[in-house]
Amino acid sequence: MEELDELAREAGELARPLNGLDPTTFPSIAAMERDIVGFMRRTLHGTGSGLLRSPVVGSVTSGGTESCLLAVKTARDLWRAEHPELARRLAREGRRPRLVTTTLVHAAFQKAAKLFDLEWDPVPCEPDGTAPASRIVDRLDDDVALVVVSAPTYPSGIIDPIAEVSAAARRLGISCHVDACFGGLALPWWPRVEPWDFRLRGVTSISADLHKFGYAPKGVSVLLHRGRRRHRAQFFATTSWAGYPVVNPTLLGSRSASPLASAWAITKRLGHEGYASLTSSCARSVTQITQAVASIPGLTIWGNPTGPALALIADESLPAHEWVDPHHLADEMVRHGFRIQHQPGSTQPDGARLPHSAHLTITPVTERALPEFLAALEQAADAVRGTPRAEARLELAALTALGFAPRSVGGRFRMPSPSVAWLILRVAGVNPGADSLPGRLAPLMTLVERLPAPVAEALLTELLARVSEP
């Protein structure tokens, strides 16, 4: 991996003076983007005789969030163009076209719905993290601008029922996007994966990050579309001002070419064989971790993930005194030199709960440290086994008394101002400065989970804002 890092640094440095705003001024930018899009098109089965009438084309973006935003914006614009009367009727009724996803879809799609004036319509998942295809398909109607399925979902590592949903979307004339930002450069070489990409005719667009399992530096992703018309709807163009004609394929205007150049160099160096080898390393690590977790009492893997991500949860089939709480486990792992990611549980729109968990992303680097990691995992589990879920009783009592948390389910609550939010965070153990988080995050995660979502979001906004505030 060090060799790839050095290659990325050298390529990025060579492209540092270039501006991706205008590839006609810097033809090398167009050449590199063309090569990357071509590589991804081949990888995701976007070539072949069946695609001649609707060729797969696309763009390089600044990251997964931008790819997801553009996928939603494109689908919305096409829906408006194809359903003008329905769009006007919904507007008169104070309604908006819908964006259908599962509750485990990446948060970027919530952001997209908010930015592009769509109604986010999340479909609840089962407790094991799966989303029944019938449940998603039942939400599809003529007011749906886009349905999104994930390969895989980030929180659980589980692949959505893409074949069934995309087929239904195609029958109904609805755009279907596959968010493969996480798995787009791992699943093509992962063992025993059912088709999820452009082999499925109902898939109209796919996002895939090159800065994850493409091993490029941060800031480069790809959005592919089935058909030129769909791709061109992604663009912004105007001649209605006194300056130069503006044509932006993505949300950004000026763009650094360094991430593009680094990604181009790495895809050229690795090729399909190199990616297959690195993916095999990830798969071996996942197999060993899965086997190790199965031997740790009180701990289990959430659902049945496919790919280089998985989440650990308490094995609640055992008595409570044998449970290994994943957030206590994550805190304890820090003492052993490893960081795994706390994920709070959540209540879905139908009232069903999704468990709190600890997320693991497995990379080729994992295999080198796997013996130490597995030993640390076992020791950390032994240390916290039977420890009850972290509480935030004092903080919750204070917030309830002040009106920032409801006294009953569905009750009213107030929103904290920035100063009050910061005071609450200080009480919860957050410190000023860049090293702001408390040593153990389990209590803070409990607080985040049990507060009304708008209040928790206000607290987290304040935390991040204070980190960089002068």
Where are these regions (language model features)?
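Hydrophobic, well-ordered secondary-structure elements that form the walls
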Residues: D179, I206, C282, M333, ...
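Conserved PLP-enzyme active-site core in the AAT-like
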Residues: S59-P249
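Generic structural signal for well-ordered, non-membrane alpha-helical segments
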Residues: T25, I29-E33, G64-C68, T102, ...
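Non-catalytic terminal extensions of PLP-dependent enzymes
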Residues: M1-R34, G38, R42-L44, S49-G50, ...
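Short Gly/Ser/Thr- and Asp/Glu-enriched loop/turn motifs at secondary-structure junctions
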Residues: R53-P55, G94, G303-A309, R353-P355
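Predominant activation on well-ordered alpha-helical scaffold segments within soluble catalytic domains
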Residues: E33-R41, L69-R76, Q110, A163-S166, ...
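Surface-exposed helix-capping loop/turn segments at secondary-structure junctions
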Residues: R42-L52, A81-L86, V293-W302
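Active-site C-terminal subdomain of aminotransferase-like
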Residues: R192, W196-E322
